[in-house]
Amino acid sequence: MANLPIIGIYKVLYSYEPQEINPGEEIPENEREISIVEDEIVCLLEKGEDDWYLVKRNVNSNDDDEEIGIVPSNYITEAEPSTKMKALYDYTQQSVDEISFQADQTLDCYGDTDSDWILVGFNNNFGLAPRNYVEGMDASSAPASQEPSASGVNAPTVSAPNSMVSPPPSFQPPSAAAPATSLPSDYNPPPPPPPPPAVEDQAADANEPDDYYSSGRAVSPEIPPTYTPKQADPLPAPPPPPPPTLPPQSTNTSQLPMPSRNVNNLGSQVNIPPPPATPSQPPRPPTNASTRSTGTSSSMAHSYDSPPSPSSPSDAYGDPNQHLKLRTDSHDDSRAYDSSSSMGNPAYEKWEVREVVGKKKKRTGILAINNKSIVLTFTKTMDAAQVWPVTDLVNYSSERKHVFIEFNSDSGITSLHLHASSNTNADNIIRALGDVAGSARAAGLREIAAASGSPMPKLPSDSALHRLNAASDAAGVNGGRTGDYEMSTVYGDRSARAEDHKPKDSSAGQKMGTVLYDFIAEAADELTVKANMRVVIVNDTASSDWWKCSVDGKEGVVPSNFIKPDTEGDAKSPPSSSKSGQGSSLSRRASKHESKHKRDSKHEARPESKHESHRESKSAEKDKKDKKDKKEDSKRSRSHSVSKPDSSKLRTWTDRTGAFKVEAEFLGYSDDKIHLHKTNGVKISVPSAKMSYKDLDYVELMTGKKVYSRTERKKDTQKQSHDHGHSHSKSHDREKEKEKKKDREHRKHRETEEEDEGPPPQPARPESTRPALAPPSSSHSNDKYDVIQERPKISYDWFDFFLRCGVDFTVCNRYTHNFNNEHLDEACIPSLNPDTLRTLGLKEGDIIRVMNHVNELNGVSTKPASAITPETKSTVNQIMSGGEALAAPVAVPAPIPAPVAEPAPPAAPAKEVVEKAPSPPATRPKSTTPQKFDDDAWANKPVTEPPVRASSVTVEPARVTESMNKMNISEEAKKPEAPSRPRTAPIPEPEEQKKAPVEKKDAEKSVQAPIPAQPTGNITIQNAYFTAPQPMAADPFQSPLYVQPTGFQPPPSALPIQPTGYMQPIPVQATGYQPLMVQPTGLQPHMTGVMPQVTGVMPQMTGVVPQMTGVMPQMTGVQVQKTGAMPQQPVNYGYQVAGMQPQATGIISQPTGIRAQATGIMTQPTGLHTQATGMMQPTGMQPQATGIMPQATGMMQPTGMQPQVTGIMPQSMPMQPQMTGVQVQKTGMVAQPMLSQYTGYQQNYTPTAMPAADGYGMQPSMNDTQAYYNMNAQTPVNYGFAGGQDTSFGYEQQQMYSPMQQQQQQYYGTEMQPDMGYQQPMMSNYYDPMQMQQQTPYGYNQTGMEGYSEYGYAQPAGNMANPMSYDPVSNASLYMPSDYNQQTQPANYYDSSFGGAQGANEAGKKASIYQATPDNPFGF
């Protein structure tokens, strides 16, 4: 850095010691700090951009003493010339530190003039000059006897001709110069020249340009960097001037050699006592210098502890009226600049800028700065000029062309975002702001002196600060000082206002705060405050939104977000001086600005304040900009010698797409790349293929080389024009869209700014924040703050309250927290309503629980309707829905009625069970206490229609019970169902079925009746059969047994059950599939697929009883013994649920059923009682199959067939069925429902596809080669399992029925078990016409409907006998042992299987159609 020329002579204002560095750390010379001493003269080599100047000290001393380094720019100021001297000879500089001048030129001399080399300057050129080449301007007045000067020559007079002046001595470098001891012994240095008179000093001050920037010093002509160290060989001396004509005695002295530069240092220091407290140093310049610029400027702007931005040596910019007309409001004296200010109306430095408003909008204007004001005027709008005093400047920074300025105003911090025309202008604006801010804030030093009680030393008369203070005192404007520097008014009226608003009752122990925004009281207990007021915070704990404050003896509440509390240090720090009020004023002013600085830097904004959040976002943006500034500064400060492009060679370069532009200097072209030097000093290389053709033409012009192909350019141009023609409309639309989007964004941004302009929103008034609070006491009725302060703490245990309401304990804590936050207590419980609970975060279910509990506390009844209402309603719904709901168990949400705790007597009829249930109340009891809410949707509503329906339904079970009582059913069947199932008792509408006409039309109308009857009957019968003897099967197999026992019950006790049983068999047929299917799923398919058949069958079933009764006597007479066997069918049916047994056992009884089916004529069954049952066999037959299945499935043993083969076997049979039944019920019943449903479902579709299989599809699907007996086996599969095709009974039974039933029994016992579930696809109809006729009327084919009698089986009686005897199916005795018909079963056989349902047969009762009456339809 030694090769830098001197660009200025500066004087040190304050001593400075450099920061200590690590011994091993290497710091460049341009970043190394040096120590300076007050009043020392230093030479300025370079001005840094970060408020640090590169200087050289002891430049006119020995080389060993020279130091080069950086010092704070605000610690030095431009030196004033100590005197003026005149050049005696021409001199040409020999090194970079020297200066060239011509003879007779007037030079300004700085510092000591007695040394051999002195610092001089002229025309903004500075350097060292030989002392013997110049003379003082007052030499003519010196006496003639004056001794020779230090140069060894007599000082010539001004009028002396040059020819009389002796030639200068030859120049010797300092290293080669002779020591001082080599001077002649008679050499006596002359006394120093007297100081210039005051008049000349003032003239010099007046002649010196005041504008620091406008009078920028011109750098001396650049010298090639060929400077050699001072230790090099001596340079040849310049030719001496012509010798002046002087007396001979003076010629000897004229030949004295030029004095060497190794004379001792500068003259004596001025003994001015140092100031008591020097300003703190600016941020240390680290190696990367990343924190100098922004750190210094921001810290100086906010704190007195660190020096302000670099101060300007002068403050005169000229008369602003000669440069710029400012539109200002005449009444705003504090803002308007004063054109009559000191120092001859200081001028404004101005720049053209654009103010950035919002995202896209900009306003063009002119920024003017002088040492008193900062003015922004707008040239294209009529907006008034914005004027800010320099003392309001808080912060300033720049980022390339963007300048960010912040001012402190009455309304808070005002931010200004300006866009300069170039980076240079932005840098100049920042420098000017630093100068004026430093000049204004230097007054703080006087306040520090006053506060510390130490007198401020007098400034040198030639210092810039002295001139500034003197001018301010003379003008009497803001920024001046009193003559004794007691107090500064640099902060204007705002500091006075802050002092006026100082709380009078404040003390050291009270908490203080600063008001951020104006607040106007709207109530008696509120306090009106202004921004920047200092208030005493009396209480800030009672409420988080409102603080009680005191100011000027008045107390009131103020929004907490309008006050900035002081830190502990601020609150505890006492005023530094109270003698004259100056210290307290300073303390208040410092705390005020410190709080503003903290508020601006930390942005402790409350989230509820939009204004604060906006400021926070601005702060974040500012931090980003600061980081960028630091990065750029670090880059700039790494090396002050970073080369910048020549501004005269800059041009704008554009890429081929036109999207990117850059200002850079062209360096050269090579390797198909264009080398550019950008304005920021970065050098880049851009491929020529990416550069625009216009720039390529420029490169070709500069280099003379061909850079691109003209053909390629032509193609690109054509392509662009072609694309432009197609995309013009699209681009036009896009531009419109962009404009619209910009407009929308602009409007939105303006609205946001308008919202952000005001202070933050005030919190809710204290009385409205907590509606549940108790009213304030009378003594504080007019003080909202006292109400908040005295609010009691909520102690009610809401957690326990919610637990008592039945709320889940996992959410009670959250609800409790919400209630406590709202300060609710037990007094609020009566007024709780669903809306309030919902607002407090309760779930809907919990709201109902809480409201029920609240109603109980309020005396409002919340008991639900009696249990009979939902039961009755569900029963009615089941009846109306065709029994579908009855088939599937339905969970009733209503509570269990009283019979659960007090079960009915065992023999109580179903009617009593129903009557015992309480009837629902007609209306809901009204609350005795007034309710505070109208929403009672959660309360139980009165039920009107269901009770009416229930009353009609409850009558029917009585009738059914009476009819059932008339039947010979065992006591177990009469037992009522368990109290927990009251809905199983009623059997709907049996009388209607009795009275129903036989016509087809009426049968279709009453389709729904049998279906519900069937489930009801099933339930009753099943309870009779399964509940008492086999409790194991009651619960798990309850559903599967409903229909099957009912449907099959008629066959076992055909005579007794037919009144209802036949209604049941028909439902069984219709729903027989349904129950099985319904139980799991099959009810729906069954209803759908078989419904038509059911419809047809139901009337048949109703009418079948008489026919069968008519036939039964014949059958009874003929086959009484078989009637004994007949019960086996029920046994099988009971086990039929298992699905496989019916065939095994069913064969025994089935011969009847089968014969009836095969023959299709009732006559054949007529011979046998079993045949009568067989007539019902369409129903019964399938039950047989079903009944048999249990043996096959349940027994899975060959023995299951033995009962069928031999009459004796029944003895073993009963045991087998029982065992099988148990097995079936446990496993068969569980698995059976699924199999039967599945099977039934498929079987239903089989009849649908085949007209002959309309009924259950069993017989029609039989194979011609299949035995009659096998048909029976299939039937139970169909009936009981709802699909005979799905079992292997029929599959293996395709073989002809052999006389030896052992063979078939094996199929049932062995083969059938593994093959269960397999369909019988090969079966086809094998019936003689007689059998088909019988099937058809029974419901397998609708063609026989017209033959229905009252009970449904309308086959001619004559047809029943004859064919029966010849038909192997009708007359099973042909294939049975002779004693088969005489076989009997044990008395307990049927009871053990199905609960004793066959007790009638054991008693010897016989059914006779001739004795049948309406009350005794079976003719027992």
Curated annotation (Swiss-Prot):
Give start-end positions of Basic residues composition bias.
589-600
Question: What are the Low complexity biased-composition ranges?
Answer: 139-151, 173-185, 572-587
UniProt feature, compositional bias: Polar residues? 152-165, 250-271, 287-301
Membrane topology per the entry is: Peripheral membrane protein
InterPro entries named in the record: DUF1720, PH-like_dom_sf, PH_SLA1, SAM/pointed_sf, SH3-like_dom_sf, SH3_domain, SHD1, Sla1_SH3_1
Where is it located? Cell membrane; Endosome membrane; Cytoplasm, Cytoskeleton, Actin patch
Report biased composition (Basic and acidic residues) as residue ranges. 326-336, 601-636, 709-742, 969-980, 991-1005
Residue(s) carrying Phosphothreonine: 929
| PTM annotation (Phosphoserine): residues | 309, 311-312, 454, 573, 577, 927
Q: Any keyword Repeat? A: yes
Which segments constitute the SH3 domain? 5-81, 82-139, 508-568
> In Gene Ontology terms, what is a biological process of this protein?
regulation of actin filament polymerization
Q: Does the keyword Cell membrane apply?
A: yes
Q: Where is this region: Disordered?
A: 138-344, 560-657, 708-786, 902-1016
Which Gene Ontology molecular-function terms are recorded? actin binding; identical protein binding; protein-macromolecule adaptor activity; ubiquitin binding
* SMART domains named among the record's database cross-references: SH3
Classify the source by domain of life: Eukaryota
Q: What segments bear the compositional bias annotation Pro residues?
A: 187-198, 235-247, 272-286
Q: Which UniProt keywords apply?
A: Actin-binding, Cell membrane, Cytoplasm, Cytoskeleton, Endocytosis, Endosome, Membrane, Phosphoprotein, Repeat, SH3 domain
Q: Name one GO cellular component term.
A: cytosol
The family this protein is said to belong to = Belongs to the SLA1 family.
Q: What does this protein do?
A: Component of the PAN1 actin cytoskeleton-regulatory complex required for the internalization of endosomes during actin-coupled endocytosis. The complex links the site of endocytosis to the cell membrane-associated actin cytoskeleton. Mediates uptake of external molecules and vacuolar degradation of plasma membrane proteins. Plays a role in the proper organization of the cell membrane-associated actin cytoskeleton and promotes its destabilization.
Among PANTHER family, the record links this protein to: ACTIN CYTOSKELETON-REGULATORY COMPLEX PROTEIN SLA1 (PTHR15735:SF19), FCH AND DOUBLE SH3 DOMAINS PROTEIN (PTHR15735)
Subunit field text: Component of the PAN1 actin cytoskeleton-regulatory complex.
Q: What is this protein called?
A: Actin cytoskeleton-regulatory complex protein sla1
- Give the source species: Schizosaccharomyces pombe (strain 972 / ATCC 24843) (Fission yeast)
The taxonomy runs: Eukaryota, Fungi, Dikarya, Ascomycota, Taphrinomycotina
Encoding gene (name) = sla1
